[in-house]
Structure formats: structure tokens, C-alpha cells
A protein has these predicted regions:
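Long, acidic, intrinsically disordered low-complexity segments
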Residues: 1-26
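A generic alpha-helix propensity feature with a strong bias for hydrophobic helices
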Residues: 5, 20-23, 65, 155-156, ...
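A near-ubiquitous, low-amplitude feature marking generic local secondary-structure context
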Residues: 18, 22, 53-57, 99, ...
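Polar/charged alpha-helical tracts
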Residues: 21-25, 29, 207, 211
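Short, contiguous, well-structured surface segments enriched in hydrophobic/aromatic residues
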Residues: 26, 30-96
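Acidic, Ser/Thr/Gly/Pro-rich intrinsically disordered interaction regions
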Residues: 100-219
Length: 219
């Protein structure tokens, strides 16, 4: 049976059937509410026993996947499509709406090439990613994920060592990427507020927003 109470509360087309600007704002606000719920659940923390002591842990990789997904979703609304989105489009959104240089082109490249794609296909927990970019001389990156909200959200640190526990042989790395999920979450959320202000004021962005709606909700 349909949830008529929820329908009444939301209203037809989020309460703005004849106001595309306010519909866009209400739509993005609704997506942000879901994103915030997911992130709060992931970062709430549970206690687990490690080496005879209790430590607080979190759902780090579901949280990271949620951040990447929301960033791509906002990018799709910004550029007018969800199909065929790539790093170039995400970088354009990031440069426009996310703090710089925290989310410059190289940071977005690492976030998506090393983490987003691996999470989508393999649900990574540990490993070493070899950076094939011509400027990095084949640096070998591993990672550590935190729940806190300090800056920078993504930081590449020189840290030469060897992974010994998970791999079947010693696996060398030269750098460690620190990912701070609380900061990533807050920055993406704040970027959406900036995007919403622009889409209400700019007809070109409204056009691209509704082009994306055509893909998400085909007539």
C-alpha cells in the first residue's frame, strides 16, 4: 500500500510543480539528507576488541564509497548527465565548488583512480596502488582512512615501508594516502549548498539540471 502520508508531506514534485528553481533546490536538499544519514551511520563508530584491548572502529569504506557517489551525483546534476561521467567532469565540479587546493586535479585523480574505481569493483580494504602518472615516477601508494574532520581531506605522505600481513609476499610502498572522511563529507555537503545557490540563480545550470533529470527519470 502506498505511503500516502509521505506523499502528502512531500507534495507533488516536491511541492514545486511550477517552480523549477525551487524544485531543484528541494531535490538536492533531499539527496543531501540521505547522504547525511548514511554518513552518520557509517561514522558513528562501534567498539571491537583488537590485541586484548577495545578500540573504536567505523564503516570506513562504505563511507568513502558514499562520498564518491555523492560527488559524482552532484557532478551529474552540474554537467547535465549521469552517463559517461569521468574524472574530467568531477574535477570541473570540484574546482568550482570544493575548497582549493584541497581538491585540485591531482587529488581528484587519486581519489577516483586509486579509490573510487577499486571500491566499486573490489571493495578494497588494503593494497598498494602504483601511480602511473608521468609526473609521479611510479610511486606506490597504500592508505589509511580516518573518521575525523581535520584538513586536508586527502593527503599523500612520503612513507616508505612494506605491507607484510595481508599480501602473500612483502609488498613495498613509497607513500601513504591519509583520507579524512569527516572532512570529505562536510566539504561535499557544503559544495552542494554552493551548487544549489547557483542553480537557483542561473538558467543554464537549471537547463543542465533538468537534462540530468531526463536521464534519471525518463518520461
Amino acid at each position: 500500500m502506498p505511503n500516502t502520508t509521505k506523499k502528502r508531506r512531500a507534495g507533488l514534485h516536491r511541492g514545486f510543480p511550477d517552480n523549477p528553481e525551487q524544485f531543484a533546490r528541494a531535490f538536492v536538499t533531499g539527496r543531501l539528507a540521505g547522504f547525511t544519514k548514511d554518513m552518520r551511520i557509517c561514522l558513528r563508530g562501534i567498539r571491537k576488541r583488537v590485541n586484548n584491548r577495545w578500540v573504536l572502529t567505523h564503516a570506513y569504506f562504505p563511507a568513502l564509497m558514499s562520498c564518491c557517489g555523492m560527488l559524482e551525483y552532484l557532478t551529474g546534476l552540474y554537467v547535465g548527465r549521469t552517463n559517461g561521467l569521468g574524472r574530467r567532469e568531477v574535477t570541473a565540479y570540484a574546482i568550482k565548488y570544493l575548497p582549493q587546493p584541497d581538491y585540485n586535479a591531482d587529488v581528484i585523480r587519486i581519489l577516483f583512480d586509486a579509490f573510487r574505481n577499486a571500491l566499486a569493483h573490489r571493495g578494497i580494504a588494503s593494497g598498494v596502488w602504483v601511480d602511473r602518472h608521468h609526473a609521479t615516477r611510479g610511486r606506490r601508494l597504500t592508505w589509511k582512512v580516518f573518521a575525523n574532520a581535520t584538513r586536508p581531506p586527502i593527503e599523500v605522505c612520503v612513507n616508505e615501508d612494506v605491507l607484510k600481513i595481508d599480501p602473500p609476499w612483502p609488498c613495498r610502498y613509497t607513500h601513504r594516502v591519509h583520507i579524512r572522511l569527516g572532512r570529505l563529507w562536510l566539504d561535499i555537503r557544503n559544495s552542494a549548498n554552493g551548487y544549489m545557490a547557483d542553480v537557483v540563480a542561473c538558467q543554464d545550470l537549471q537547463k543542465q539540471f533538468f537534462q540530468c533529470m531526463e536521464e534519471l527519470y525518463p518520461r
